[in-house]
């Protein structure tokens, strides 16, 4: 089924047949049986009703058919001359996706609702007078439902054409002790294209697409596809030239027998890329590894990197999306007027339309990173297998990360500026009504009009620094009687995730500190976000396998530590904590190695074997961390030729 968006409402006309606030008399002069009795303040001609959030369940389930094709053509040559090896290849690949989905037309739905005869669609049905939570005594006729059901189609295509030339020489220059400097370098050209063709009912462009204008209010909303914000077609292309080089320099080798330096290697590399749309960029890298003893290695690296903005964020015209937010300026009015005693009682939730768009002036994201660590492979007695333990401490600093200023931060800044007597121009509102004026009367605040949308174009944001430490344990052993066993455990600890606050966010933080606005307003997009929302401090996973002839049995487990929700508080002002979770998957595989079934592997498995629910959060669960699927079994057959 499908539901409406809060920012694209359906207005039920005053004279619509099923309007519970409709006229006292129908068009034929008979008494309106659908007008609620005992209404006060509702005129005889009735009043319109605005539907902002309703799931039209009797419209049936949505079926989505996805057709995906991928093609790849690759050809190349390789050869050598002297100590040099070379390789050149050409590649062309493209992928197409077609999504066909059942949907609802807002225009046709409103027309069906606003009929003045009994064959109108009734959005207020469900339940019965005597049993309101059971059954439906006012079922809509299927032909009425069919009048506004549609199918929407979205087509997407990407292409990549690439040519490259690589050369390498493992003995470019002789060094002491029989060592040699090796080199690898190359050039590359690629052409990328992207096209996203939305359904005409979702494009939102007047005169081009099938759009929705509320027939009662006359307000233009763009998208006629219910539950979908306006999304125009997007297309873009770019050409990229790149070149790279890498030197491998072995300064010390085991044959040199230097105490405490079994080997010492250095890697020096660099890469340059020239984009037709975002300019040029060049970045270096240096890495080193030092084997003190056999089985014990220290390693480290320092590098700079970059990532170009994708074609969608560069070329999108206007992109509307709806999220839930809170109007804290109205909470301030409620607090000053005595309607609430604290912000914990605030109930000013609102649907926020975020209006973003592509930005052709975006620059590549840039990063500087380092890591150092150790690898320990202690010798074990014969028959005991091999164990490897690694630990790596790392840091990544990013600048110019492509993103959007959070819509709630824009509302928070509007709250601050309105307390100071102005407003945030990125927050667009209607002119205040009489009710809006009455709401702030006596509070010292200026009237606040209904929220229309928040503008938030893609931009290069301020720096981010992420620190962490990774641990890995890998153990393998093969026995003569019981097959082979493998154990791998990974643990990642997030130490720091510092986001430099944009000016708008920092202004809110400072205003909270000096008491200008309420300190209970949650602020995102600034500070250290470890343990907050989607950034748990610990992630641990383990994989255990047993191989015996053609049989493999395996188990996988994953643990994610708890986090707190930045925008959810209890009455004491404490953040709501979302519990951690551990899940387990099991599988068994049988691989045939002879006969007609040779190369065939059959797998039976179960994911989330203990049927764990995702931990409770304010939105149900945190989709960025957890999967909602219950325990389920699966089987697969794979054939290798």
Where is each model-derived feature located?
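Transmembrane beta-strands of outer-membrane beta-barrel proteins
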Residues: 1, 86-88, 181-187, 243, ...
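Surface-exposed, low-complexity loop segments enriched in small/polar and acidic residues
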Residues: 1-240, 254, 303, 307-364, ...
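Outer-membrane beta-barrel translocator domains and adjoining extracellular loop/strand segments
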Residues: 2, 69, 99-105, 196-202, ...
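Residues that define the transmembrane beta-barrel architecture of outer-membrane proteins
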Residues: 67-71, 159-161, 237-243, 280-282, ...
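Short loop/turn motifs that connect adjacent beta-strands in outer-membrane beta-barrel proteins
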Residues: 79-86, 170-181, 252-264, 295, ...
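Transmembrane beta-strands of outer-membrane beta-barrel pores
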Residues: 81-83, 92-98, 171, 187-195, ...
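C-terminal beta-signal and adjacent terminal beta-strands/loops
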Residues: 108, 388, 399, 495-498, ...
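C-terminal beta-barrel architecture of Gram-negative outer-membrane proteins
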Residues: 321, 490-596
């Amino acid at each position: 089924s499908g539901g409406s968006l809060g920012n694209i409402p359906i207005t039920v006309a005053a004279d619509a047949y099923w309007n519970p606030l409709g006229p006292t008399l129908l068009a034929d002069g008979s008494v309106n049986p659908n007008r609620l009795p005992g209404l006060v303040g509702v005129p005889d001609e009735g009043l319109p009703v605005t539907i902002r959030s309703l799931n039209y369940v009797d419209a049936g389930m949505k079926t989505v058919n996805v057709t995906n094709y991928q093609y790849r053509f690759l050809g190349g040559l390789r050869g050598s001359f002297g100590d040099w090896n070379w390789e050149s290849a050409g590649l062309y690949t493209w992928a197409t996706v077609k999504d066909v989905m059942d949907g609802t037309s807002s225009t046709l739905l409103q027309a069906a609702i606003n009929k003045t005869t009994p064959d109108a669609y009734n959005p207020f049905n469900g339940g019965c007078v005597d049993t309101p939570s059971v059954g439906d005594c006012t079922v809509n006729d299927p032909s009425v439902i069919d009048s506004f059901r549609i199918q929407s189609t979205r087509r997407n295509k990407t292409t990549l054409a690439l040519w490259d030339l690589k050369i390498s020489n493992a003995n470019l220059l002789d060094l002491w002790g029989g060592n040699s400097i090796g080199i690898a370098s190359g050039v590359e050209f690629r052409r990328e294209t992207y096209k996203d063709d939305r359904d005409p009912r979702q494009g939102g462009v007047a005169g081009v697409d099938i759009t929705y204008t509320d027939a009662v209010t006359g307000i233009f909303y763009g998208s006629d596809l219910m539950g979908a914000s306006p999304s125009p077609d997007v297309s873009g292309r770019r050409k990229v030239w790149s070149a790279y080089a890498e030197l491998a320099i072995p300064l010390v080798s085991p044959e040199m027998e230097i105490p405490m330096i079994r080997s010492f290697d250095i890697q020096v590399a660099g890469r340059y890329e020239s984009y037709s749309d975002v300019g040029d960029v060049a970045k270096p890298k240096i890495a080193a590894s030092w084997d003190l003893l056999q089985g014990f290695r220290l390693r480290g690296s320092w590098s700079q990197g970059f990532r170009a903005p994708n074609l969608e964020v560069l070329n999108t015209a206007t992109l509307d999306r709806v999220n839930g937010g809170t109007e804290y300026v109205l909470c301030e009015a409620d607090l000053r007027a005595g309607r609430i005693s604290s912000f914990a009682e605030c109930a000013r939730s609102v649907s926020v339309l975020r209006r973003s768009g592509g930005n052709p002036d975006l620059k590549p994201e840039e990063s500087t990173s380092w890591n150092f660590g150790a690898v320990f492979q202690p010798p074990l007695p014969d028959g005991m297998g091999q164990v490897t333990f690694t630990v790596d401490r790392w840091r990544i600093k990013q600048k110019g990360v492509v993103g959007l200023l959070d819509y709630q931060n824009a509302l928070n800044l509007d709250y601050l500026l309105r307390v100071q007597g102005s407003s945030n121009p990125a927050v667009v509102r209607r002119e205040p009504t009489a009710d809006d004026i009455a709401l702030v009367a006596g509070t010292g605040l200026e009237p606040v009009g209904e929220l229309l949308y928040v503008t938030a174009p893609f931009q290069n944001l301020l720096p981010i620094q992420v620190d962490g430490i990774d641990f890995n344990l890998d153990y393998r052993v093969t026995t003569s009687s019981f097959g082979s066993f493998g154990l791998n455990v990974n643990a990642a600890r997030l130490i720091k995730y510092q986001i430099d606050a944009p000016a708008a966010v920092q202004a809110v933080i400072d205003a909270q500190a000096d008491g200008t606005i309420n300190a209970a307003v949650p602020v995102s997009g600034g500070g250290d976000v470890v343990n907050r929302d989607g950034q748990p401090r610990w992630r641990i996973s383990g994989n255990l396998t047993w191989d015996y002839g053609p049989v493999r049995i395996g188990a996988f487990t994953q643990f994610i530590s708890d986090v707190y929700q930045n925008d959810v508080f209890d009455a004491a002002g404490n953040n709501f904590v979302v519990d951690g979770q551990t899940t387990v998957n099991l599988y068994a595989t049988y691989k045939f190695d002879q006969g007609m079934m040779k190369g065939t592997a059959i797998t039976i498995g179960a994911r989330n074997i203990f049927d764990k629910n995702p931990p409770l959060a304010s939105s149900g669960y945190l989709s960025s961390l957890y999967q909602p699927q219950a325990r389920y079994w699966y089987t697969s057959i794979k054939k290798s030729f």
